[in-house]
Amino acid sequence: MNLRHLLATSAATALLSPIAHAAGDMPPAQPPQPAEGADLPTISVTDTRHLPESFDQRYATTQVLTRADLDRLSPSDPSITQALATLPGVTVSQNGGPGSSASVSIRGSSASQVAVFIDGIRIGSPTTGIAPWADLPTEAFERVEVISGPAAASFGANAMGGVVQLFTRRAAGQPNQTTVSFGGGSNKTFDTQLRTSGTVPSTGPLAALGGLTYTLGLHDYNTAGIDATRPVLPYHEDGRNPYHAQDLDARLGYARDNWSISTFALYHRSDLSYDNAGFANRELDHQLTTGLAFHLDVTPDTQFDQSFGYANDRQFLYASDPAIPTDQINSQRISSSTSLTHQAHGFHLFGLPLSGETKVAYDFTREQAFLPVDVPDGVPTRNDSAFSLHQSATLGSVTMFVAGRHEIIAGKAVNTGNAALSWAITPVYTARVSYGNAFRLPSFNDLYYPGYGNPDLSPERSDSVEAALDANTAYGTFSAAIYDTRVSNLIAYNPATFSPINIGRAHIRGIDLSYKGTIGRYTPVSVAIGILNPQDETNDSWLNRRPRQTVSVNVDHTWDEFHLHALSTGASLSYGGTTFDDPANTTYLPSYLSVNLRASYRINAHLTVSATLSNLFDRQYMTAYGYNTLGRTAFGKVSYTF
């Protein structure tokens, strides 16, 4: 069987139970005030993994995609990847059309060097070490938060290039609201959604549950797809590769004066056809992530948080030839997290106001994987226990943040740390310098796969420094960051032993630039630019599939000046620079430019219609050699809310 597909991970079956397990391939003193009249977006990085609640641009480069952003930027994409690609320093490569394996890189990292969480619960396959990006449904999430740079002291393993936090949809205390939508478009694509959310009233037959918030979403996406591969690949097969995905997300929450409890579940099922002539060429995935969280305000300045998580991935690999047996890969992760946070304020030093926050935390994770082959030492299992301490302090216009983490993984100790210092130079400009180290754990495939794995592998390690300048002006927000990362112990394949070993070194330097603001009154604009120098020092080459320049421009306009306030139109431009597909830099991937158009019209308070035209000029390009991307496609949708 083709190793490329056998090593792919899988996805999970189970459903939400507040008392069940709770929890997840390829591929501050006051902050500076804005200038008068400035209309600025709010950045609120949520405290789900023991970061201070004030964690923001003063500690690390942070980008947030709101629900409105997701609706605009990926209206026809079933996965979250298209929206992520609009952020500075984020690049996406994919092996074909919808549903095919995808890889997300932050600041030149590999896909396995990005930590991903859903409502604070880690996701990603223990077998491959990569999140199932193509199977993360855009419609399930309220917002997305991306932290660029190392954050292992707060998030643990794999947070080398950055962290992606996905937060599921939730009710905001409003009465019941239900939305039904139907969409369709090119490649025989059909999209059906139902979403309801609200708060149980404190009167009536359910008064005993008064104040309980709930949300439930159902999503069905079906497409005939495209021919994912080109004839240059040896396993190419003619014909389209259809994809069918079904998603369910649910959440319950209840809050009193000083405590709250919530539980969520996200279930995904998909059926994908892919090219792999003579071997397994159909993949059935089941994925479940579920969690339970409790919060208590011990005092007005002290908070206690406890959460439990469970993630299960199950994947079935089928072949067209019935003589070829079906393979099954099953992995699971159980986790718990406990933290205590205290804020101190009202102090003065040298005549300046002094405040701070201290957080201590303990995390535990247990990972297991059941492979379709015999492993000599039995079922691969890994336990991870971690203690961490976080401290922030603000004196006048200067803020300091330090974090340290001591982790015991499979009996071996790993220590990581982060430090940042920011200075509010003026009410408009804030400067920041930071340092962090991080690590990436070997995947179970790296360690144990028969005929390939090496159980003596050590974690990959990195050290990063960053300098940044942020400006909050009347014209919008500007951010510039320059970073330098050195990676050691990179896991690379050794042809002499037919197994991976720790021999690689990399030096990654880059600049991230971003702008977000409004031109006039009705035209929001966002621009993201990434400049990357990703050097593989071991092979004296470029790290593969890392474009050296990326640009994303998004412009929208509401036509209020013509009294058409219900009409909104927009355009997106995406550019990816040249790169190579292979580590030896022998397979060239040219640059590409893609333009998308969109329009939305609110007919009345209940009914909205929208349309998108993607890849307007029908550019034929590749983000992975031999794999096609979508050509020009059209998609329309009707939504009704009641």
Region roles according to the model:
Residues 280-289, 297, 330-332, 430, ...:
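Outer-membrane beta-barrel signature, preferentially recognizing the C-terminal barrel domain
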Residues 26, 356, 393-399, 484-486, ...:
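Gram-negative outer-membrane beta-barrel transporters
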Residues 165, 174-175, 181-183, 195-286:
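Periplasmic-side early beta-strands and strand-to-turn transitions of outer-membrane beta-barrels
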Residues 41-73, 103, 111:
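N-terminal periplasmic "start-of-domain" segments of outer-membrane beta-barrel proteins
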Residues 81-125, 142:
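Extracytoplasmic beta-strand/coil segments of soluble accessory domains associated
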Residues 121-148:
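Short acidic/polar hinge/loop motifs at secondary-structure boundaries
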